[in-house]
Amino acid sequence: MYHPGRSPSFLITLANVICAAILFDIHTGGYQPGSLIPIVAWMTPFVTLLWLSASFATYLYKYVRTRLLPEEKVARVYYTAQSAPYFDPALGVMMQFAPSHGGASIEVQVNPSWISLLGGSLKINGDDASNESAVLGSFYSSVKPGDEPASLVAIKSGPQTIGFGCRTKIDGDDCLFTANHVWNNSMRPTALAKRGKQVAIEDWETPLSCDHKMLDFVVVRVPKHVWSKLGVKATQLVCPSDKDAVTCYGGSSSDNLLSGTGVCSKVDFSWKLTHSCPTAAGWSGTPIYSSRGVVGMHVGFEDIGKLNRGVNAFYVSNYLLRSQETLPPELSVIEIPFEDVETRSYEFIEVEIKGRGKAKLGKREFAWIPESGKYWADDDDDSLPPPPKVVDGKMVWSSAQETVAEPLNYQRAAGSRPLPPFLNLQATTSKKEKQPLQEECPLDLLGSRLASLESCVEKILQMKSLELLGSSQNCQTSPGPSEAPKQSFTPCYSKQESLIPLESQGILKELVKTSLSATPPPNPVTVSVEKPGPSTQSTKKSARRRNRRKSTRKPVQESPSPASPQPTKTSLRGI
């Protein structure tokens, strides 16, 4: 495929851009006067100018040297019917014909099987060896010189036209695309003709070709000055569509062309297409034109008198001859491994493409055949090298295709003895560095600390509650409770914190700090905010019912007895 980095013009342009940057730096005073860089920078544009002049002179020389000669034509002699068919009792159906060059007319016997063909134009070619066929009910139209497509070109062998082709681009290369049996046959092509002028064919390269009957094509690299001399322009290869109106061109010379119109039809195999355009001898390789471009190339007849066959040019250029790995999606064709071909229910055709290799073509699939033709696992046992023979319990390798005289794995490897310690070795004084221990808090230690903290807090609260109860009993003016105490969900420690002296509160805070510093931090918990739903509403209702029951309970009027004080137990949450 064409790559811009490999073109000499691209490299020269890049060098001139660099030199232009250097010259700009020189103009702005970026280099010293004695430096050699400005000289090299001026030499590059000068060499580029010489190269362009030499290239233009070479092109002019080749253009002038290419000779444009008048197209050679065959002086065809034919006879024209002068009378209607008539019946002769002895000879059958007869007709009178007169020669085209003038002279006396002759009487010709008409074959009875041809009588039905006399009412219209010629339907089927008379040459039995021809691969072309007209289509019943179709007619040929004359084409004025200059009205044919600009990409169409005739292929000549002496004065005879042996086929047609078109100029197009395949994998980035400008080339001639035609049928292989036109370019490589006994009648060697000698010239390309366009609008009555022809250019002699030289030893042009054919990098890609296939001689299979169903996939008949060749790619010829024609020099650009030849295309320019003939006035042939490139065309585009497009994907064919079903029931697409198409036209084929052909004739005895490039300035005496006929055209036939028909309909293009796609078949199960994507590399093939059929059309109903009438053709004649010498039309092989002619492009099949649609309103969008070239959809295929005519190669022969499919059903004589009804359908003709062509090669899908878009499939060939974009799937078989494409150097890129990415395939276009227009035809939905995929490449499969070679071993998957046998798993398909239909038959693949095997083709060999010069310049690409062998391939298997299916309906919407194709596979490239490995160079050996099969994988190593498919080799027959006879093709494998003979194994060694066993004689008297020993393996004889003389008859085997091996490079050793003894087996690689005998009984076992020889035993190895450890080396004695070296006497000159001395002990080193280096000490092993101790790794710093990471602080950790085991679960049992944490549990014991929490238990001791709770017991300490509980004892202090019991002592303070007893002191408060004793002082309240000794007080004469202390009124009783005016109302029943309400149940509170506040922790016990928070309620009685005001009752604890300041000295005890400091001790408790120090204990809490010591316990929390030895406790590892808890994992963060992500709080998810839920939207109110049926479950949350039912939870709120049940909470309201519980609060109503608590409010309707009978309040306790009696004060706690000093003889039986109720110790208050608090948890770590209240600290």
UniProtKB/Swiss-Prot annotation:
Pfam families: Peptidase_S39. It is an enzyme of class 3 (hydrolase). The record marks E132, S133, E325, T326, E402, T403, E497, S498 as: Cleavage. InterPro entries: Peptidase_S1_PA, Peptidase_S1_PA_chymotrypsin, Peptidase_S39B_luteovirus. SUPFAM superfamilies: Trypsin-like serine proteases. Residues 541-553 have a biased composition (Basic residues). GO terms for molecular function: serine-type endopeptidase activity; transferase activity. GO terms for cellular component: host cell membrane; membrane. Residues 558-575 have a biased composition (Polar residues). One of its GO terms (biological process) is proteolysis. This is Polyprotein P2A. The lineage of its organism: Viruses, Riboviria, Orthornavirae, Pisuviricota, Pisoniviricetes.
